[in-house]
């Protein structure tokens, strides 16, 4: 198996939607949301922990002070009903709405998106100050067709920026940053693994390894069995730290890296499954690619000229008054006629909304609390997903602070670096932001985004932001930065107490149990979405959004007026 397949991105993807709960106000108002757009008024902008100028203040400007009250309906009948309410205005919720508005535009689905915060985008947090542009949540995405379609449909085609696919990626091993092979011809020559380790990996990928066990394997068990100890310790373990901030001895191979896991199931070995997949694609070619989409040149990652926040901002602007911010869901009930009644705390008091279907894209622990009145079994399953803390630490150094041995043609080049937990550093990984995308730092400066914490280091919650910045700086001076360099400029330290859902062994069992409990309890039309369902990468959230939209459309097809 190529290391390229498991090391294709250095981006660490954080949860894409979140929702805070707060106490309800007084003054109950029951309304019918009309399908026509209403005017919206401005809100307030998000601020950063250290330097607090946001490039996306527009994303915060969605307060709904004046709610239309045409068709006020105080009971269960006689008034109109929404087709769908999407709970959570992070990237998953917004992209479900966008999919309903574009891919299924012919159906004229009447929906709203509700978000408890005063801005959309969830944990996507782009900041800008003094010539710097940095991310404090997700950093980038892989430019899959689903992501590119969402960007183009949002009017952002000309704002896309893609990293150089030839830029190297590095892993720290034995005190040295070592490049990860980016193409098959690199495999014999890279020094991250020994010659015997490469032979072991090749033989295992061909099928000369122990047979798979009957039980669900962890990532560590699967990789050690199939590809050997070196691939696990020097490639996959740091990759798990960088993508999931997780412990590979607990992560489920099937759930966390299903596309690799299924190869062995399909073809008897990783290579066998790969060959079978290639043949299946030849026998069943995809439909013609959308000619509107740009074509990336090789494996790379992408963003937008002014950061990831451009996407949720653009989607929200296009959806207009269908997006309701500062709407905190306080209760959900099922009526006798099959509709759902949702109660919200809003700036205008309590609002009740009636709908045929609901998609919950909030984190599982929030969904658990909200759904407990409907199903204890579903709520209990959803409460068991684990979210460890992660901090995003953005530092800037003068270019001359970079160690000479880490420069390529006199510049810091590459996507970034990942760190195995065995190498004695706290930092999980480092993104070379100013090398990856243009316009991220002033001339003569570098911008470096670092992640620290995760499932193996929850103690970051006991540290101050200054202590976290010092810990990252200390690690970098052992690897990338000259020990005697001046102190960095700390642009931002953002701590996410519950960051990335862990796809642990038994993940699908919990998810299936929650879904089954809702269905068996008579709660059809109530769907679960978000990153704990689709996958943690931003691209998987968008792909999952299209899947959720298809579920909603299929459910609504039972109504004669659809």
Swiss-Prot record:
This is Protoporphyrinogen oxidase 1, chloroplastic. Belongs to the protoporphyrinogen/coproporphyrinogen oxidase family. Protoporphyrinogen oxidase subfamily. Binds 1 FAD per subunit. Catalyzes the 6-electron oxidation of protoporphyrinogen-IX to form protoporphyrin-IX. Residues 274-302 are annotated as: Disordered. It comes from the Eukaryota. It holds the Pfam family Amino_oxidase. InterPro entries: Amino_oxidase, FAD/NAD-bd_sf, Protoporphyrinogen_oxidase, Zeta_carotene_desat/Oxidored. It catalyses: protoporphyrinogen IX + 3 O2 = protoporphyrin IX + 3 H2O2. Pathway: Porphyrin-containing compound metabolism; protoporphyrin-IX biosynthesis; protoporphyrin-IX from protoporphyrinogen-IX: step 1/1; Porphyrin-containing compound metabolism; chlorophyll biosynthesis.
